[in-house]
Amino acid sequence: MKIVIAPDSFKESLTAQQVAEAIKRGFQQSIADVECLLCPVGDGGEGTVDAIRHSLDLEEKCLQVTGPFGQKEVMRYFQKEQLALFEVADLVGLGKIPLEKRNPLQIQTRGIGELIRHLISQEIKEIYIGVGGTASNDGGIGIAAGLGYQFYDEDGNALPVCGQSLLNLASVSTENRYEIPEDVHIRILADVVSPLCGHQGATYTFGKQKGLDSTMFEAVDQAIQDFYEKVSPATLKLKGAGAGGGIAGGLCAFAQASIVSGIDTCLDLIDFDKKVSDVDLVIVGEGRLDRQSLAGKAPIGVAKRTPVGVPVVAICGSLVEDLPSLPFENIQAAFSILEKSEPLEDSLKNASLYLEHTASNIGHLLNMPKI
């Protein structure tokens, strides 16, 4: 039996690669001569680039850039020939910022623009960027600063490059801006369709989880809108521009980037269609499968790309009651790995073992003679 194992990461627990390896161990315990092909995936959220780099065997490199509080910090990126990938969360992710320092209006993203300039200087032509899981809400002003834009208040004083400065922004200088060469293509791997502004935008949708006081939502949202009406009105209409606290919008406006489906691009990059052309079973999974998963998340994206006639089974941390009845979206069956009632902390810690057990049990079911 040949099985493709293509899970997303389990948030705050296991990377997609670790999930795939645990499931493989489970099948090896219960199915003789099973062939497991690991294809960790991501939909544009945090962990997507890490999943892709395992599948493509990319080389890890590092560059010193401006960190979230203005200090110098080393940032990773992954490269193969003229292709490079990196994840914004590697510099300004929620996990990188101590709780006591979490203020999305003070987090700086200038380093992202600096890294883009470096990659272009190294003859990179294809750049893929994951923008999920950020701690910032700067509307993309940091990206612009990293690409040479400068910002001033009413008195002509240079402003710090963070979201807070949008509230005092009076003018923008493009004198030293960096032009992206025409032969360089920058693509944003997105898993959300939030616009920059409005009640479905970056601030209202993600501000609270990043530590922004709700009393600030209206002022910050308006400041981002005012900023883009000055520099790039068209970006205000882009679906997905609100991803990463507006970093996606900044990349589109100042680096001529385009927003693409995170999961479909991931599957294209790892040549998923070829890998799944002659398999007996496909396994998908993520930490929590719910109705939101139906809107472009990894498990559904993988299932839709799986050929008709190849069964798809989901192995997830938890299954939420709002899911439609199975089968749905080409997924034939879904299993939660939770074995007992226990604190969330323990479930996260034991996830690898529970994945093994669940996969092993599914393997035993597959071994049963047809009834």
From Swiss-Prot:
Keyword annotations from UniProtKB, A to Z: ATP-binding, Kinase, Nucleotide-binding, Transferase
Class of enzymatic activity (EC top level): transferase
Record keyword rRNA-binding present: no
GO MF assignments: ATP binding; glycerate 2-kinase activity; glycerate kinase activity
EC number: 2.7.1.31
Entries under Pfam families matching the protein: Gly_kinase
Gene3D superfamilies documented for this protein: Glycerate kinase, domain 1, Glycerate kinase, domain 2
Substrates-to-products reaction catalysed: (R)-glycerate + ATP = (2R)-3-phosphoglycerate + ADP + H(+)
GO BP term (any one): organic acid phosphorylation
NCBIfam families the record matches: glycerate kinase
Family: Belongs to the glycerate kinase type-1 family.
Cross-referenced PANTHER family: GLYCERATE KINASE
Entry protein name: Glycerate kinase
Source species: Neisseria meningitidis serogroup B (strain ATCC BAA-335 / MC58)
